[in-house]
């Protein structure tokens, strides 16, 4: 979510019997085994003479073959399409992938080589497990969504498909008071198209669809116990936009490599801008330089707070603040074929209760009811109007606007460059262990 300036069959063990296989039975020889038994019965009957021969040979009932996977029924499950199996049922004992690990450089290299420092980092295991679980959920849903989204689909269908998958994988549907604060959506699914760079999700009744020639930014968050994983990608169907998408990917990777404890924000911004603005894109016979959107930034992430207070610029100059140990950052880049500057535009859909919300008297009764529901269900996590609809709220706009004007709830309107331009986004989370 953008910050704006001014922002296997689990080890199945078979009995290793040392006795010789009966009648030359092989590993794949069920049929041979049955035939051999019948032969033995015939020999026994012949040895008993006429009495045995007179007896009808009993037919052996064929053995029931075990169903594939039955032996591993208690083992890990596999994911479905769309994703609906909670990840803790796939990754047993919370053994989630660690993700990409970058070694500390220069004067911070001791954090990698010191056994004591690495031991202290491992003491934060519960904290990291929450992040890794959230990251695995995000990766799974992101991977599925890339293949699933097709031209002609409505934005509402796409947003709800992603959000239903996230809730299923966390195991929390968020329909009971407080459930959405245990785990679920870190913030609403952003589906910002073309010149709109961020903070757009469909409200109820929205009829917009994604078209073949569109450039859509898919930005959604997953949280586990308030640890928010914020990641985004740009989806296109026409290869003409490939360079625009690649510019953001490469710039984000440059920012991630530059980031680290004691690194100045301005240095990260310079590295990002150098890579981003080395690209250009040709659209309909006209060549456009890819520009950084200079008033959009990455940001630190707090506990239950998507914008933690520090910003990571994507252009050179400016903030000399350093990254510190124990902090989590969303390294986020935006490229544009337009002016490289965004303004508030279109209908607002994203909101969040302020962590420093003032205590003021609310004279609108619907505002009081709505605030109580927001506090119970979202806390300071961002939400959108569709989430209020999902909880059964009706005719709440007056109360919501009252909360915004009172400074209790922050509104995040869509951020757009000039019409006719195209914008792209790439984002990943980086965590710097504390010692």
UniProtKB/Swiss-Prot annotation:
GO terms for biological process: proteolysis. Residues 20-29 have a biased composition (Polar residues). Residues 32-46 have a biased composition (Acidic residues). One of its GO terms (molecular function) is aminopeptidase activity. Residues 10-19 have a biased composition (Basic and acidic residues). It catalyses: Release of N-terminal amino acids, preferentially methionine, from peptides and arylamides. Its EC number is 3.4.11.18. The keyword Lipid biosynthesis does not apply. Its cofactor is Co(2+); Zn(2+); Mn(2+); Fe(2+). Binds 2 divalent metal cations per subunit. Has a high-affinity and a low affinity metal-binding site. The true nature of the physiological cofactor is under debate. The enzyme is active with cobalt, zinc, manganese or divalent iron ions. Most likely, methionine aminopeptidases function as mononuclear Fe(2+)-metalloproteases under physiological conditions, and the catalytically relevant metal-binding site has been assigned to the histidine-containing high-affinity site. InterPro entries: Creatinase/aminopeptidase-like, Met_Aminopeptidase_Type2, Pept_M24, Pept_M24_MAP, Pept_M24A_MAP2, Pept_M24A_MAP2_BS, WH-like_DNA-bd_sf, WH_DNA-bd_sf. The keyword GTP-binding does not apply. A divalent metal cation 2 binds at residues 230, 299, 332, 427. A divalent metal cation 1 binds at residues 219, 230, 427. Gene3D superfamilies: Creatinase/methionine aminopeptidase superfamily, Winged helix-like DNA-binding domain superfamily/Winged helix DNA-binding domain. Belongs to the peptidase M24A family. Methionine aminopeptidase eukaryotic type 2 subfamily. Cotranslationally removes the N-terminal methionine from nascent proteins. The N-terminal methionine is often cleaved when the second residue in the primary sequence is small and uncharged (Met-Ala-, Cys, Gly, Pro, Ser, Thr, or Val). This is Methionine aminopeptidase 2. It comes from Phaeosphaeria nodorum (strain SN15 / ATCC MYA-4574 / FGSC 10173) (Glume blotch fungus).
């Amino acid at each position: 979510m953008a910050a704006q300036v001014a922002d296997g069959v689990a080890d199945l063990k078979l009995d290793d019997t040392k006795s010789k296989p009966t009648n030359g039975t092989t590993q794949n020889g069920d049929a041979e085994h049955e035939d051999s038994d019948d032969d033995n019965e015939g020999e026994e009957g012949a040895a008993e003479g006429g009495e045995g021969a007179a007896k009808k040979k009993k037919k052996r009932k064929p053995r029931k073959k075990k169903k594939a996977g039955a032996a591993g029924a208690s083992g890990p499950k596999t994911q479905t399409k769309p994703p609906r199996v909670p990840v803790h049922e796939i990754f047993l004992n919370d053994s989630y992938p660690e993700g990409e690990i970058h070694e500390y450089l220069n004067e911070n290299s001791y954090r990698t080589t010191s056994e004591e420092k690495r031991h202290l980092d491992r003491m934060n295991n519960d904290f990291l497990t929450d992040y890794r679980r959230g990251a695995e959920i995000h990766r799974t849903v992101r991977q599925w969504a890339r293949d699933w989204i097709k031209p002609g689909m409505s934005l509402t269908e796409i947003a709800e498909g992603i959000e239903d998958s996230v809730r299923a994988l966390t195991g929390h549907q968020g329909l009971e008071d407080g459930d959405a604060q245990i785990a679920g959506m870190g913030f609403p699914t952003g589906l910002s198209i073309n010149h709109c760079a961020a903070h757009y999700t469909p409200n109820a009744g929205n009829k917009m669809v994604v078209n073949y020639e569109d450039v859509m930014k898919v930005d959604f968050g997953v949280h586990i116990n308030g640890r928010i994983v914020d990641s985004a990608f740009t989806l296109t169907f026409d290869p003409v936009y490939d360079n625009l998408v690649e510019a953001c990917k490469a710039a984000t990777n440059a920012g991630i490599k530059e980031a680290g404890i004691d690194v100045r924000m301005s240095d990260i911004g310079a590295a990002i801008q150098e890579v981003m603005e080395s690209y250009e894109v040709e659209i309909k016979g006209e060549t456009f330089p890819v520009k950084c959107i200079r008033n959009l930034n990455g940001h630190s992430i707090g506990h239950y707070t998507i914008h933690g207070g520090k910003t990571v610029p994507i252009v050179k100059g400016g903030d000399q603040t350093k990254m510190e140990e124990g902090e989590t950052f969303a390294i986020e880049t935006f490229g544009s074929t337009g002016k490289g500057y965004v303004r508030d535009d279109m209908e607002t859909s994203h909101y969040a209760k302020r962590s420093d919300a003032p205590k003021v008297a609310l004279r609108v009764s619907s505002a009081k009811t709505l605030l109580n529901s927001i506090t119970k269900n979202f806390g300071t996590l961002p939400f959108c109007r569709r989430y209020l609809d999902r909880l059964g709220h009706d005719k709440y706009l007056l109360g919501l606007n009252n909360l915004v004007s009172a400074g209790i709830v922050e509104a995040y309107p869509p951020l757009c460059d000039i019409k006719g331009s195209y914008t792209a986004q790439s984002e990943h989370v980086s965590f710097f262990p504390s010692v």
